[in-house]
């Protein structure tokens, strides 16, 4: 190594849309640098969880330290920091990028640029990173490198004349990627302070070590035995061990400035080491933390209830364990009259919710009922207090409410020109307001402000279907905005079912109420008595449908004769039904709770 220890370090991450070959390229880079032997190089090395593999999402083991001997004869220390690709995890992406000096922008040469990579690339450029375009999948017959280069220049606006064309699958030209990293990505720069500053890129829970934090040391050094201060929580922890991933975990004597590695300090849960926070020495702290830290706020909420009430303690334990690994997951106990005991959970987005639900069902063998996801609303009461409401059933009485505000997001949609009309129609249906339409080569960027409540249910699926799968979407939260919202309750035989309450725009309330009643009528099984299904706003009923009773033919044994005999039997049956209706309870199947989701899918 040269006299300046940071001169030969290169910290970089890979930005790519889902399925553009990010994990495969990472595998090839690890293989070329000899991180793993050939027999160990089976599948995507960096995706360790089975759900990650299936869905192609990256959560853990997010950094690899490699040694590379370049063509100029020098040894370089490469730190690859992997980033999640999905919009739900955009905060994690921004933290991963903050730890780097450069990024590889991987674009599938057969498909061109997609919205996710555009958003992440803008984040990288804003943070001053050197972006190196890589065109992947050039072995495919449909690959068109010139078109992909032109798209990078028009859509993202960075120079792609020196883009490296590779095939990660076959390993063709991957060596050139390593040379580009060494030559074009700058080395880490020393900071203006001598005191220790380290950025937490990610944290996860290990059963033996407690919390393992992946950190980028900006200035100073970390050695075992140091007492570290977590700047946002104000707590101190003693360092047990430090090291790097190669991608196996390897222990080192210390981590110095410019390096990326892991730190364990017997922290008991991931909330003790939040992503994006700054570590410094307790004895000699840095004057201020690194910029950009924010608490991760859940955006989508849903109720999770065990089908069997006896599973409630198991569900609590499973959620506690998941939370050790997932700082964005929030939950609190909830009691529903219809479903019994369960939890109200907060997620980053729909994908995050699906992953959590899938992990609970797979890893912990739980059978769950999920209520319709809702977003968080702000309610301004008449006395001037502002409350955040994540559960429609907890909405204050109408006479106490001054205004209700819903979350608005800014969405950027990239679509081929043929489908612009369909995309605009879809956004207008979802109460969107158009910001801009920009024609970029053979892609169109449509920017809309949309209510988040309309996006969380089925917007993504509908967008894919109206554009035959070609459009891609990226969004971020903007603000809360006031609007005429009401809560539509569902009453079954006069009893309110809290899990079926939804908050809707007043103009859509009647239609939603009518559709909900019709849908429930098909799903609730017939009973021995009439079941009345009503949709109501406050005390005003806006729609009703009835599940007719099953009835026995009590007149079957009567032959001709006097009508009064028949009347007596019918009256007796009617009395019995009336009594049953008073004491009878209607079992509501799981499909009925999901009906709330499917109303818009007609």
Curated annotation (Swiss-Prot):
UniProt-annotated location(s): Cell inner membrane
Keyword GTP-binding recorded: yes
Keywords: Cell inner membrane, Cell membrane, GTP-binding, Hydrolase, Membrane, Nucleotide-binding, Protein biosynthesis
CDD domains: EF4_II, EF4_III, LepA, lepA_C
Reactions catalysed: GTP + H2O = GDP + phosphate + H(+)
The tr-type G domain, residue ranges: 7-189
Binding site for GTP: 19-24, 136-139
GO-annotated biological processes: positive regulation of translation
SMART domains associated with the record: EFG_C
Membrane topology of this protein: Peripheral membrane protein
Pfam families recorded: EFG_C, GTP_EFTU, GTP_EFTU_D2, LepA_C
GO molecular function: GTP binding; GTPase activity; guanosine tetraphosphate binding; ribosome binding; translation elongation factor activity
EC number(s) per entry: 3.6.5.n1
Chief location of this protein within or outside the cell: membrane
A cellular component annotation (GO) from this entry: plasma membrane
SUPFAM superfamilies reported for this sequence: EF-G C-terminal domain-like, P-loop containing nucleoside triphosphate hydrolases, Translation proteins
Gene3D superfamilies assigned to the protein according to its UniProt record, in alphabetical order: 3.30.70.240, Elongation factor 4, C-terminal domain, Elongation Factor G (Translational Gtpase), domain 3, P-loop containing nucleotide triphosphate hydrolases, Translation factors
Annotated signal peptide: none
Function: Required for accurate and efficient protein synthesis under certain stress conditions. May act as a fidelity factor of the translation reaction, by catalyzing a one-codon backward translocation of tRNAs on improperly translocated ribosomes. Back-translocation proceeds from a post-translocation (POST) complex to a pre-translocation (PRE) complex, thus giving elongation factor G a second chance to translocate the tRNAs correctly. Binds to ribosomes in a GTP-dependent manner.
Similarity annotation: Belongs to the TRAFAC class translation factor GTPase superfamily. Classic translation factor GTPase family. LepA subfamily.
Name of the protein described by the UniProt record: Elongation factor 4
Gene, per the UniProt record: lepA
